[in-house]
A protein has these predicted regions:
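Active-site palm subdomain of RNA-directed nucleic acid polymerases
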Residues: 209-223, 324-357
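Catalytic-core region of right-hand nucleic acid polymerases
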Residues: 159, 194, 210, 263-287
């Protein structure tokens, strides 16, 4: 390399020109941003920027150190990876204590129809674009761009899976990304929820199965989570009307708000199959869903790299298209006794409010959770 005086001078002059151009480009970008923020459409951008700035300080991708179970700060990449793996492996393979079910339930043996093209089209339409891909690196946009050729191929593929009750082995792998809950210590693993990045093609398969299950399974009216045309607003309105009626009648109404701890992660698989069968789901679909959970494996992607792979043997898949409705089925069956004793019990996913005219009845219903394996989060109940 020629380090002559002329070359050094030319290099410095080039540096100054680049800095001036970068400064001009920044100023232009800021001017355009400020102009947009002054408009009605720019309000969303303003809130998005504020949220992003807050999130950057708490994002797992920015947090390169983490605490172990005893509160000691880990700094080496190897120890941080080991801690993330230890935490999620324990979380996703630990069941709450519960009473084992002794009663059997009759399985529904019936023939199921083949997957139709219109079902695949609807599933494709429901899939959002621009989402993070799973280990196979195939985004849903690929199938959307292929149009009818994709519909033809996927319909054939899904029918083979339905017939054999075996999905491709690659779909059993996932990448788990810790997402900060925006509360508590940013260096504590327990303040993160894990979202699995799964194959988009598997999610299409899940949506086809979910659409069929929704047609045969009737979820109770008291469940407001994961149900079409229902929201927290409806649950709040119903509870408010109930309280006003009792106040007008000068009668007692006892309400207990219950948050189930790690309910999504610790649903026993056997409980899932039991609840599906009790809800009248055809045995064919039960076996298909069982196959989705068989030999499932994941790795944790954190700021310092990727952990070693481990098995996931308990709970529902976070980030799955089918899991929300499966959870609704489980909660529907597990809360059946509560709803019979306290007909005003309301649920939004795993958040429950038990209402009764007597305190004794409320306390009795709370004990049912111990039998079903659902553990209360005492800090939020």
């Amino acid at each position: 390399m020629d380090r002559s005086k002329e070359n050094r001078q030319e290099y410095k002059e080039s540096q100054r020109r680049v800095k001036r151009e970068v400064s001009k480009a920044k100023q232009k970008a800021y001017d355009e941003l400020y102009t947009r923020l002054d408009t009605r459409e720019g309000e969303k951008d303003l809130y998005r920027l504020a949220r992003q700035r807050d999130r950057d300080g708490k994002d797992v991708q920015q947090v390169r150190v983490i605490k172990d179970r005893d509160g000691r700060v880990l700094t080496s990449e190897e120890s941080v990876q080991r801690r993330w793996k230890e935490y999620f492996e324990e979380l996703m393979n630990e069941e709450n204590e519960r009473e084992k079910r002794v009663e059997g339930v009759n399985s529904v043996e019936q023939k199921v129809d083949k997957i139709r093209k219109d079902e695949v089209r609807k599933a494709l339409k429901r899939m959002k674009s621009g989402k993070a891909v799973g280990p196979d690196d195939i985004p849903v946009e690929v199938w959307k761009c292929l149009g009818e050729a994709a519909v033809e191929f996927l319909t054939s593929l899904f029918n083979r899976i339905l017939e054999s009750e075996r999905m491709p082995g690659e779909w059993r792998r996932s990448v788990l990304v810790p997402i900060f809950k925006n509360k508590g210590d940013v260096q504590s693993c327990s303040n993160y929820r894990g979202i699995k990045l799964m194959s988009h093609t598997m999610k299409l398969w899940e949506r086809v199965v979910e659409a069929r299950l929704r047609k045969v399974v009737e979820i109770c009216e008291q469940q407001y989570g994961f149900m079409p045309r229902k929201s927290t607003t409806d649950a709040i309105f119903a509870l408010r009307i109930l309280m006003e009626k009792y106040r007008d009648g000068q009668r007692e109404l006892h309400c207990v708000f219950v948050d189930l701890e790690k309910a999504y992660d610790r649903v026993p698989r056997e409980e899932m199959w039991y609840c599906m069968r009790k809800s009248g789901v055809a045995e064919k679909y039960v076996r298909v869903v069982q196959d989705m959970y068989e030999r499932s494996r994941t790795v944790v992607r954190c700021a310092v790299g990727q952990t070693k792979e481990f098995n996931v043997e308990v709970g529902l898949h976070q980030g799955s298209a089918l899991s929300p409705f499966l959870f609704a089925i489980v909660m529907d069956q597990l809360s059946e006794e509560d709803r019979q004793e306290s007909p005003w019990t309301m649920m939004f996913a795993d958040d429950i409010v038990i209402c009764s005219e007597s305190r004794e009845q409320v306390e009795e219903n709370l004990e049912v959770e111990v039998c079903t394996g659902e553990k209360r989060n005492e800090s939020q109940s």
